[in-house]
Amino acid sequence: MAAKIRKGDKVIVLSGRDKGRTGEVFEVRPDAGKALVRGINVVKRHQKQTQTQEGGIISKEAPIDLSNIAIVGKDGKPTRVGFKILADGKKVRVAKRSGAEIDG
């Protein structure tokens, strides 16, 4: 299946405690169907001390399910993603709401 959400996309959270917040995807895990979004779904983790890293409680982003996020269109509203094949044979992502091409 083609990737509808990719690294670098600006997304909005559709459900959960961060509903309505936007952020940038910095990692996608297609095998698990999850993504990491900067500043979204931040949890506290107890970090054991190592030689290079100090121990303590750290905050980090936890994966969020791909079904709970949507790409933000040019109008600032969430949009679904479709695919279109151009005349030169190149496959591009298209916003279903506006029909505009999605960069990336």
Curated annotation (Swiss-Prot):
Q: Which cysteines are joined by disulfide bonds?
A: none
Question: Matching SMART domains, A to Z?
Answer: KOW
Q: Does the keyword Ribonucleoprotein apply?
A: yes
Q: List, alphabetically, the SUPFAM superfamilies matched.
A: Translation proteins SH3-like domain
The record's annotation in InterPro entries points to: KOW, Rib_uL2_dom2, Ribosomal_uL24, Ribosomal_uL24_CS, Ribosomal_uL24_KOW, Translation_prot_SH3-like_sf
Give the top-rank taxon of the lineage listed in the UniProt record for this protein. Answer: Bacteria
What Gene Ontology terms describe what this protein does at the molecular function level?
A: rRNA binding; structural constituent of ribosome
Any one Gene Ontology cellular component term annotated for this protein: ribonucleoprotein complex
Task: Describe the processing and modification events after translation.
Answer: A methylated and unmethylated form are thought to exist.
**What keywords are assigned to this protein?**
Methylation, Ribonucleoprotein, Ribosomal protein, RNA-binding, rRNA-binding
Please cite one Gene Ontology biological process associated with this protein: translation
Family, according to the entry, reads as follows: Belongs to the universal ribosomal protein uL24 family.
Indicate the quaternary assembly.
Part of the 50S ribosomal subunit.
Function according to Swiss-Prot or TrEMBL? One of two assembly initiator proteins, it binds directly to the 5'-end of the 23S rRNA, where it nucleates assembly of the 50S subunit.
Output the NCBIfam families linked to this UniProt entry: rplX_bact (TIGR01079)
Stated name of the protein: Large ribosomal subunit protein uL24
Q: Which gene encodes it?
A: rplX
